Amino acid sequence: SDINSPADLKGKAAAVQPKGNTGEAITAHMLQSQGLTYDDLPRVNHGSYTDAVSLMKDGNAEFFTLGTTVPAGAVMDLASARDIKIVPIEGEHLAKMQELNPGYKQIVIPAGSYPGQDADVNTIGYATHIIARCSLDADVVYNLLKALNEYVPDLSAIAKAVGNATPETMGRDIGVPLHDGA
């Protein structure tokens, strides 16, 4: 593929998540950071990860984007059938995206996460939040967070990134008030 950075996406057929999905919003920001919109792409297919993998396998999409944990089943599926290239988002590309959303941060997809990926790849990451209505009973919120904290080792077996969660990181200021039960 001749896609080596976000700057190379103009004129390429895309497979992205449904409108309003986090991955789709990040894709729109990635394009916007390069002065592009979906109108600069010949085809944009909004669908599931499974749809995106099928489009890539069939040659009907030249790139797909997703916001998920590593390793991702969809990427593993594609990599089992086709050679893949994970396009880095770093340096000026990351900085432009952070202008659009300061919550984006640099993360690394470790070498060997996917078949044929022999080097670390820098990309963007973001935090996931649990949002509760203010009127939710404080005991319910407390017990939910207590259980989440207690089962971090079990949860990290499903989503490795959860393994870094601690009461301190869970309670980090994200710019909105924490619930009374938190």
Please tell me what each predicted stretch does:
Residues 16, 63-67, 87:
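Structural recognition of the beta-strand scaffold that forms the well-ordered cores
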Residues 7-10, 87-100, 107:
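Non-catalytic interaction surface on structured domains
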Residues 51, 58, 68-86, 96-103, ...:
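An extracytoplasmic/periplasmic, membrane-proximal ligand-sensing/linker region
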Residues 1-58, 152-156, 172-181:
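Bilobed "Venus flytrap"/periplasmic-binding protein-like clamshell domains
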Residues 1-3, 97, 101, 115-119, ...:
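A bilobed periplasmic-binding-protein/Venus flytrap-type ligand-binding module shared by bacterial periplasmic
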